Amino acid sequence: VLSHLDQDHSGAFPLIQQEIPVKQLISNEQLPNDLKQPFQYCHQGQQWHYPELDIQILWPKEKDLAFVASNQNQYSCVVYLQFKKVGGYQNFLIMGDAGWEAEYELLKDYPNLKIDVLVLGHHGSKHSSAYDFLATLKPKLAIASAGFDNRYGHPSQQVIARLKALHIPLKSTVEQGTLSFVLENHKIVLHDRRLDRLWLSRGF
């Protein structure tokens, strides 16, 4: 599943294709034909069930796919993962670049959603992760996926303040580096690893 086709969300897909056999791609917009990949649009209601994992698409609604071209971010595929027969982190909500409108609709459509890990919308932008959304979901952990020294300042100070006020721990790839959830001894745990790499500021 690609949440949408912005480069920072889909750019590595050709490399993934080289390493992992992909039977079908799911996204809110169809990829260029040169990628030669069976495709399906994502929309609310899609579900896939496996012995150890349930996957659901919670957003966008099928009727909203017509508006994706004008607002890719807001109509990102929002994915809900439920791992079964494991301890630790079990329920994951991955927001893509969706913002407040999607959050409001999710709370309306799924009032009893159980979340252990929330991957913040739009890298922790101030226009996502509304206070009421965070307060209702009450995740055990929030994740902000953002590039080091990114020009937007993600995750935003406003979102960081909301999380602190609600006592929701935050892990950020800016601070912790690569974040990986790993199954160990029937329990899903989080590992972080900062690569030994030279970072150049934008001034160079």
Question: Residue ranges of each PLM-predicted region?
Answer:
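Non-globular, low-confidence helical/coil segments that flank catalytic cores
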Residues: 1-204
